[in-house]
Curated annotation (Swiss-Prot):
Keywords: 4Fe-4S, Iron, Iron-sulfur, Metal-binding, Methyltransferase, rRNA processing, S-adenosyl-L-methionine, Transferase. SUPFAM superfamilies: Nucleic acid-binding proteins, S-adenosyl-L-methionine-dependent methyltransferases. Residues 1-10 have a biased composition (Basic residues). This is 23S rRNA (uracil(1939)-C(5))-methyltransferase RlmD. One of its GO terms (molecular function) is 4 iron, 4 sulfur cluster binding. Its EC number is 2.1.1.190. PANTHER family: 23S RRNA (URACIL(1939)-C(5))-METHYLTRANSFERASE RLMD, RNA M5U METHYLTRANSFERASE. It comes from Chromohalobacter salexigens (strain ATCC BAA-138 / DSM 3043 / CIP 106854 / NCIMB 13768 / 1H11). It catalyses: uridine(1939) in 23S rRNA + S-adenosyl-L-methionine = 5-methyluridine(1939) in 23S rRNA + S-adenosyl-L-homocysteine + H(+).
Length: 475
């Protein structure tokens, strides 16, 4: 978001590095012969030890490489460093496909071969479960293209001292903006809008009133959502012209405290749609800007298809889909089971889930609103539970499920550490991990999506609606 009131030009990544490193940067004579990179940390940085045994995290260094480094941040237990000279190069090193890589903070693994990235993520998932005393079965890797995969992104906007607007992504670990003209991981329909959007910002009466710009690729084409901190009538007309000229849908999200969505160039029915391609059908999911959508449409479809294959429904199961969103798993599973109820915290998304089910003719779908951070739903009459919680996981839900009669659980997670923690609680409750998958939803980053199938033969007990003891806190 724009930092209002700051009267200075946005720093480039190089300026930021010089400022941060400044007096903190040092070259130890003891490391003149270089450090050997032993492994990758979970966040993708190389891990070495200096001659004194202190751990050093090295940006963009790979296992097997020997590097001379400069330390730019010293901590009590470890140092953080960057490469000054590479003395030996890993065969897994790749040429980054992006001209902005190393400055832009959007990607952090473009210097590593794509297959090696996936192996690193597989090891990360396995290590996190080992720390919990758990052994995973063979991890299936679900992967698609490495570039042009991202169907949603948020671009920062900032004006310099002269009032010139800049558009791009933040530098890694910083609020400083990296100006870009394109992005190789965005779907092309979105990437080619970046330069025209910057040109439009330059023409605005009040570009400082734009906080950020969100881009979404939908069945209707590209959608642009402008975070407008305050209405500017003249700029509204300019954005309308931009939408018409570039054949995009466009909305303002206006206001500071509780911004409202207002369409300036609306899709038919003021609803967008994304498609979910399954083996035997293609589903259309209605959504609006702000609804949760998986970033990678192709890998999301692979994830859902894998879930259906693992579960192998016979048409008689009663299913609960928690954190259901607009129906990603709910609608895919509905024709194959006796009944399925999607539960979601957002009332608006619950309405869209119900509408999506009606449009698809799926009468066995129920949609309910519930704050799953504070309330565990009734599961006594349920055979299967599916859940795809936010990054913090679902610790309270897993405690309740461990003592419930549910025998089959499909758990999708965007945080492998939270998944490992929750899986340990479920295993204590008698579940067994039957299948595991890594979904490479975010190629060229250290982020990973994962999925488990857990089953047990004998239920632990009867379940009722259970209030969390720490009422009011998130999962």
């Amino acid at each position: 978001m724009a930092m209002l009131g700051k009267r200075r030009p946005p720093r480039t990544a190089n300026e930021r590095v010089r400022r941060e490193r400044g007096s903190a940067t040092r070259r130890d004579d003891a490391t003149a012969d270089g450090l050997s990179i032993e492994r990758l940390a979970h966040d993708g940085r190389g891990v070495a030890r200096d001659p004194h045994g202190k751990t050093v995290f090295v940006d963009q260094a790979l296992p097997g490489e020997r590097v001379r480094v400069a330390v730019h941040r010293q901590r009590k237990r470890f140092d953080e460093a960057h490469v000054v000279e590479r003395l030996a190069t890993s065969p897994e090193r790749a040429t980054p496909p992006c001209a902005y890589y190393g400055r832009c903070g959007g990607c952090d693994l473009q210097h590593l071969d794509l297959e090696a990235q996936r192996e690193h993520k597989r090891r990360t998932l396995d290590e996190l479960f080992t720390r919990q005393g758990l052994t995973l079965p063979e991890i299936e890797v679900l992967a698609g293209e490495g570039l042009a995969y991202r169907r949603r992104a948020r671009l920062g906007v900032k004006c310099d001292a002269e009032g010139t607007p800049h558009l791009g992504f933040r530098a890694r670990g910083s609020e400083h903006l990296i100006d870009i003209d394109s992005c190789v991981v965005l779907e092309p329909v979105l990437s080619r809008l970046i330069a025209p959007l910057r040109a439009c910002l330059v023409q605005l009466e009040a570009p400082r009133r734009v906080g950020h710009i969100e881009l979404i690729a939908t069945a209707e084409g590209a959608c642009v959502v402008v975070r407008q901190l305050r209405e500017v009538p003249g700029d509204e007309a300019r954005w309308r012209r931009f939408a018409a000229e570039h054949d995009v849908t466009l909305a303002w999200r206006v206001g500071r405290e509780a911004p409202t969505l207002r369409w300036l160039h609306a899709p038919r029915g003021e609803a967008l749609h994304v498609t979910l391609v399954l083996d035997d059908t293609t589903l259309s999911l209605g959504c609006v800007p702000g609804d949760f959508l998986q970033i990678n449409a192709d890998v999301n479809a692979r994830l859902v298809r894998t879930a259906l294959a693992w579960l192998a429904p016979r048409g008689e199961e009663r299913v609960l889909d928690l954190f259901a969103g607009v129906g990603n798993f709910t609608l895919a599973l509905a024709p194959r089971v006796a009944s399925i109820t999607g539960i979601e915290g957002s009332p608006a998304m619950v309405e869209r889930l119900a509408d999506n089910a009606r449009r698809a003719g799926l009468h066995q779908v129920g949609a309910q609103q519930s704050d799953l951070a504070t309330q565990v739903p009734e599961v006594a009459a349920v055979d299967w539970v599916i859940m795809d919680p936010p990054r913090g996981g679902a610790e309270a839900l897993c405690r309740a499920l461990a003592d419930s009669p549910v025998t089959t659980l499909l758990y999708v997670s965007c945080d492998p550490a939270a998944l490992a923690r929750d899986a340990a609680r479920l295993v204590q409750g008698g579940y067994r991990i039957q299948r595991a998958a890594l979904a490479d939803m975010f190629p060229h980053t250290a982020h990973l999506e994962s999925m488990l199938l857990l089953t047990r033969d004998t239920p632990r007990g009867r379940s009722t609606s259970v209030e969390r003891e720490d009422h009011g806190q998130g999962p």
